[in-house]
């Protein structure tokens, strides 16, 4: 069975873990209602995406409308 030959130093351990940090989640302002939402996602407050209503307001994702692309 493979066993480490030497103890991993705190510096080397920290360098290995340097890419595991969590980043700040991006948010954008909804162009319809002004609430904060995630980029490229339907607004959970008003149901608009890309300037048109995709989800009926207050349905929380149930009953998606068929969006007609203009």
From Swiss-Prot:
Family of this protein: Belongs to the bacterial ribosomal protein bL32 family.
Underlying gene: rpmF
Keyword Ribosomal protein included in the entry's annotation: yes
Stated name of the protein: Large ribosomal subunit protein bL32
Keywords: Ribonucleoprotein, Ribosomal protein
Compositionally biased residues, Basic residues: 1-19
Pfam families: Ribosomal_L32p
NCBIfam families for the chain: rpmF_bact (TIGR01031)
GO biological process: one example: translation
Organism: Gluconobacter oxydans (strain 621H) (Gluconobacter suboxydans)
InterPro entries reported in the protein's UniProt record: Ribosomal_bL32, Ribosomal_bL32_bact, Ribosomal_zn-bd
Sequence segments annotated as region (Disordered): 1-21
Molecular-function GO terms, alphabetical: structural constituent of ribosome
GO terms for cellular component: large ribosomal subunit
